[in-house]
């Protein structure tokens, strides 16, 4: 996530927006239907280039969803020229923040009167940053053994459909459960790939 944010000129602190959106769970799903690390709704995901259908749901694809989030954040920044307003718009929507900035005639988005959830949103991002950057200050004592080790993986480019993902997984020396755990955007036991995307 961090290299993709950097590559797109998005401030590194926006990784904490992802933390509060999904608790860094790539398979997170809200009761409203938002999904993945960045909690895209289906329509917004499609608007920002993600494939969402019964076979594939790229909202669960860590890299592609992060790139889509960067496009969203850059679009919002082009409107507001203010990263705090951008963060608030991720929660409230770009149209709502734009209308409130105009209606309330304020120069600083922190001065906006917003619904409680959105008003707290930016501060939740800042709180997550503080916790991650100084855990011992808040009573968290983490040892290296408490952390998840990096998971070894092999990246494979697929440009056509796969009729049987279980057989495909076996041919790569793993099973279907591991394949789908590492690729939660795969929704079925086959991959049609009608779009020809990689």
Residues covered by each model-derived region:
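Short, surface-exposed glycine/acidic/tryptophan-bearing loops
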Residues: 27-49
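Extracytoplasmic and endomembrane cell-envelope/extracellular-matrix remodeling and assembly machinery
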Residues: 1-2, 7-8, 47, 52-55, ...
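Solvent-exposed coil/turn segments that connect beta secondary-structure elements
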Residues: 22-23, 43-45, 130
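Export/targeting segments at the very N-terminus of extracytoplasmic proteins
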Residues: 1-23
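Alpha-helix N-capping/helix-start residues
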Residues: 11-12, 42, 176
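Alpha-helical scaffolds flanking conserved acidic
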Residues: 11-18, 35, 83-88
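A general structural motif at alpha-helix termini
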Residues: 18-21, 41, 90, 182-183
């Amino acid at each position: 996530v961090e290299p993709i944010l950097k590559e797109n000129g998005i401030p590194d602190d926006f990784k904490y927006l992802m933390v509060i959106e999904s608790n860094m769970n790539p398979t997170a799903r809200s009761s409203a239907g938002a999904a993945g690390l960045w909690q895209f709704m289906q329509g917004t995901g499609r608007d920002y280039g993600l494939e969402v259908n019964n076979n594939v749901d790229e909202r669960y694809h860590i890299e592609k969803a992060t790139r889509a989030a960067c496009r969203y954040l850059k679009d919002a920044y082009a409107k507001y020229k203010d990263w705090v307003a951008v963060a608030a718009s991720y929660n409230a929507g770009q149209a709502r923040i734009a209308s409130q900035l105009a209606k309330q005639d304020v120069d600083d988005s922190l001065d906006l009167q917003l619904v409680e959830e959105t008003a707290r949103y930016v501060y939740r991002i800042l709180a997550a940053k503080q916790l991650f950057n100084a855990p011992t200050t808040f009573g968290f004592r983490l040892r290296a053994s408490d952390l998840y080790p990096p998971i070894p993986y092999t990246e494979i480019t697929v440009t056509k459909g796969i009729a049987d993902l279980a057989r495909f997984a076996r041919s790569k020396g793993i099973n279907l459960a591991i394949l789908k755990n590492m690729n939660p955007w795969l929704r079925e036991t086959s991959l049609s790939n009608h779009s020809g995307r990689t």
